[in-house]
């Protein structure tokens, strides 16, 4: 089969156009860092890219929730620590008040100190955060999603710390009144006070557990976020090594096609002469 000069010419033109397009595309990928220009370039990759973008927005939400819960639990822990210190001092004062040689007048003085400690505990229990929200929340306490399938309580409730089991302020008020009257705290008073301390300590333990769970969830979410970003990069970002190799190859093929065209032009010129 004989191939005409026109067929060779047309083939060379098509080859030049294709290689020029390949060069331009490789240059675009390298300069933009994006593997695809339009979603239609690879519908599957585009669809997966949308899913990955949604996943990234989810991890951004997790980060906001993590920061919120961390700030809340940090404030909770600080208030519980202050309450525990005040209660321990109150308990020590009760032990002192049970000392028989102390006398009625000295117990009344202890009653004044007990009132100051009770007021301090009340202030700690009703403290507010920087946003004006009570650190010990009204029940029920809300939860927040801090990692995939991981929800944590955002705080502790006031009732959980101050009311459930023993009413902390009521117990303190009763004992303070006993001391203010010059009387010695009873065995029941001592038992109630120990129960109050146990109740607050239990709240501290729970806060610590929530903080540990938050740390673990934050670390897990960060690892998953990194994996999602890696998937996105592998799917949508330019592979510089591959794109550079493609550019070199396409440039070489384009130059070869241009050389063929030049020879065709020369041959055509000689034929005309």
Features from the language model and the residues they span:
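Amphipathic alpha-helical polymerization modules
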Residues: 1-137, 177-273
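Cysteine-poor, low-complexity segments in flexible/peripheral regions
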Residues: 139-181
């Amino acid at each position: 089969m004989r191939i005409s000069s026109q067929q060779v010419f047309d083939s060379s033109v098509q080859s030049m156009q294709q290689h020029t397009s390949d060069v331009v595309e490789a240059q675009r990928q390298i300069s933009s860092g994006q593997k695809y220009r339009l979603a239609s370039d690879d519908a599957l990759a585009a669809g997966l890219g949308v899913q990955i973008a949604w996943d990234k927005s989810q991890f951004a939400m997790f980060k906001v929730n993590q920061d919120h819960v961390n700030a809340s639990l940090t404030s909770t822990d600080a208030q519980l620590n202050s309450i525990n210190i005040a209660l321990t001092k109150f308990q020590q004062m009760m032990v002192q008040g049970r000392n028989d040689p102390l006398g009625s007048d000295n117990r009344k003085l202890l009653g004044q100190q007990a009132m100051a400690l009770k007021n301090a505990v009340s202030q700690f229990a009703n403290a507010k955060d920087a946003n004006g929200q009570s650190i010990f929340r009204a029940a029920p306490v809300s939860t927040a999603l801090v990692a995939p399938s991981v929800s944590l309580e955002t705080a502790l409730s006031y009732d959980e710390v101050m009311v459930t089991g023993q009413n902390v302020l009521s117990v303190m008020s009763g004992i303070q009144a006993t001391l203010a009257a010059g009387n010695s705290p009873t065995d029941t008073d001592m038992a109630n006070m120990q129960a109050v301390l146990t109740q607050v300590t239990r709240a501290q333990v729970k806060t610590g557990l929530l903080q540990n769970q938050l740390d673990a969830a934050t670390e897990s979410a960060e690892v998953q976020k990194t994996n999602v970003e890696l998937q996105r990069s592998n799917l949508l970002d330019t592979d510089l090594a591959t794109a550079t190799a493609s550019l070199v190859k396409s440039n070489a093929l384009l130059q070869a096609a241009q050389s063929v065209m030049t020879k065709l032009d020369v041959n055509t010129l000689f034929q005309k002469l």
